[in-house]
Regions:
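Bacterial N-terminal signal peptides that target proteins for export
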Residues: 2-12
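Bacterial N-terminal signal peptides
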Residues: 13-20
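C-terminal motif of bacterial Sec signal peptides marking the signal peptidase cleavage site
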Residues: 23-24
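Boundary/activation segment at the start of structured domains
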Residues: 29-108
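Functional beta-strand-loop-alpha-helix junction segments that form "active/interaction loops"
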Residues: 86-173
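Sec/Tat-exported extracytoplasmic proteins
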Residues: 102-106, 157, 161, 185-188, ...
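Catalytic cores of nucleophile-dependent amide-cleaving enzymes
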Residues: 171-251
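Caspase-like cysteine protease fold
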Residues: 260-288
């Protein structure tokens, strides 16, 4: 038993070590200035458009690009920590960023890539290879607008923000019209507060995945207002990389249980972070 506990403790320490190195979520007293455009002043104001093909299922992923300058993080190498350069960014164009990882996936086909605006620097639209009614839309938010990205995620989870887009003559839902909404990036709620109301407006429960450090602790108070269902989020420092979401979605699309989806996420984390499965399960949790 002593030997088993020693192995487990070593795995947990290793997990936390790698999480610290790669998550870069801890603010070491860093003074930051985060730009925030409120819903009343931004062009990206709240919409409530609901007319879309109800046979489609959208997964909308909002990514706050890693940003050494505008986020309260332990700095990463300059090349991958430029929040205004999605092509090289840790959470987008790097090897385990959303764009690179999903473009290489055998499960998803990239239909379109487009530049959006000064806040959402790029949008990707994927379609699932076998379950063709499933679409994944990923938006890369300029890192200095992490507050907008966080707010848009919560507005979407609550049903306050809804939109649509047309791809190959099919109109699919976005934001609150999505079946699942995901946030990926630094946990900005460790650095700032949001005073907006994210109260659910349509009595619908949306699924969500939040890949950010301590996301259960910091997102819980606001997420409860939205009535969303947290399928996967974190209990500690973590590296919010694309393979976690990718493998979790494989279970989600197959209509697996929340525990099975969480298990897929943990197994992926264990594999890529070289930590024990048990340690990964302690990090990536499901439900309240």
């Amino acid at each position: 038993m002593h030997k088993i506990m020693k192995i487990y403790n070593s795995s947990l320490i290793l997990l936390l070590f790698f999480s610290f190195i790669f998550s870069n979520c801890e603010n070491k007293g860093k003074n930051i200035t985060t730009t925030f455009l409120s819903k009343n002043t931004t062009k990206n104001k709240l919409k409530n458009v609901e007319n879309f093909d109800k046979n489609t299922q959208t997964i909308h992923v909002l990514v706050a690009l890693c940003d050494n300058k505008y986020q309260g993080i332990v700095p990463v190498p300059e090349k991958i920590g430029n929040g205004q350069d999605p092509d090289q960014n840790l959470y987008w164009g790097a090897a385990y960023g959303i764009r690179t990882y999903f473009k290489k996936s055998k499960d998803w086909k990239l239909l379109k890539s487009e530049k959006k605006d000064s806040i959402r620097m790029e949008r990707l639209i994927f379609q699932h290879i076998s379950k063709k009614n499933y679409y994944l839309v990923a938006d890369a938010y300029d890192g200095q607008y992490i507050k907008n990205c966080t707010a848009d995620f919560l507005y979407s989870s609550s049903g306050q923000m809804k939109d649509v887009l047309t791809i190959n003559n099919t109109r699919i839902g976005l934001y609150g019209n999505s079946r699942l909404v995901s946030y990926i990036g630094h946990d900005g709620l460790m650095d700032f507060q949001l005073s907006e109301s994210f109260k659910n407006t349509d009595n619908q429960t949306r699924d969500c995945i939040i890949l950010a450090c301590y996301s259960k602790k910091f997102f819980s108070p606001l997420l409860k207002e939205t009535k969303a269902n947290p399928l996967v989020w974190s209990s500690h420092l973590m590296a919010p990389e694309a393979y976690i979401l990718h493998d979790a979605l494989a279970g989600y699309i197959n209509k697996e249980s929340a525990e099975q989806i969480r298990s897929r996420a943990a197994l992926a984390y264990s594999k890529y972070q070289k930590c024990s499965e048990k340690a990964a399960r302690n990090l990536l949790v499901t439900g309240w």
